[in-house]
């Protein structure tokens, strides 16, 4: 039986350039899954585009590090904004877990309002759901809602986190990322998964057209390089040749 490869494009809703890049990678490439930032400046645009792509599985990209939250979070925000200080707070044991749980629920409900259905799965911006204090909240929430979630098993093992009851892939990698994006890198990451015997594997990606919002990101031009690789006909052929079928978290 074919192995399942989920190429998930993160950051749907970040900007129109990001959205159009994800749509391009779906229509002409190997992306069949994405995750939406419901507090993103272009999330309504993303929702409208998704209705033209019934084959694109759309999950929720839980956001605790960028923009404004949907609910009051005085314990986490600074001047009303979310930010990357969340890791320092995690190390200090000062995370407002009640606020985070409430925000997770608000973002989920906002997703349903925008997209007209529940997300295929849950992951997060900057992998905040893998912070040890936050992981159980998200895992229990996903299991309760009956949706899948992204699990970085290396982080899970290093922090001895209890495995979620929510469906997930056997493998996951964020290694298709950085300044040296290429088809060779993509296939190296995929071959490493096959060598581990994983029958289902998620590859994180960030394909985009660069616009003013994307240019503000520390990870900018590589998003365009990712788009070139992910829409390459030779990549699609190489994936099929290795015995993989492309899909989304609905195929688990």
UniProtKB/Swiss-Prot annotation:
InterPro entries, A to Z: COD_ChbG_bac (IPR022948), Glyco_hydro/deAcase_b/a-brl (IPR011330), YdjC-like (IPR006879)
GO CC, one annotated term: cytoplasm
Free-text function comment from the UniProt entry: Involved in the degradation of chitin. ChbG is essential for growth on the acetylated chitooligosaccharides chitobiose and chitotriose but is dispensable for growth on cellobiose and chitosan dimer, the deacetylated form of chitobiose. Deacetylation of chitobiose-6-P and chitotriose-6-P is necessary for both the activation of the chb promoter by the regulatory protein ChbR and the hydrolysis of phosphorylated beta-glucosides by the phospho-beta-glucosidase ChbF.
Known cofactor(s): Mg(2+)
UniProt cross-references to Pfam families, sorted A to Z: YdjC
Encoding gene (name): chbG
Protein name: Chitooligosaccharide deacetylase
GO molecular function: chitin disaccharide deacetylase activity; deacetylase activity; metal ion binding
Catalytic activity: N,N'-diacetylchitobiose + H2O = N-acetyl-beta-D-glucosaminyl-(1->4)-D-glucosamine + acetate; diacetylchitobiose-6'-phosphate + H2O = N'-monoacetylchitobiose-6'-phosphate + acetate
Species of the source: Enterobacter sp. (strain 638)
Localization per record: Cytoplasm
Subunit (UniProt): Homodimer.
Leading EC class: hydrolase
Binding site residues for Mg(2+): 61, 125
SUPFAM superfamilies: Glycoside hydrolase/deacetylase (SSF88713)
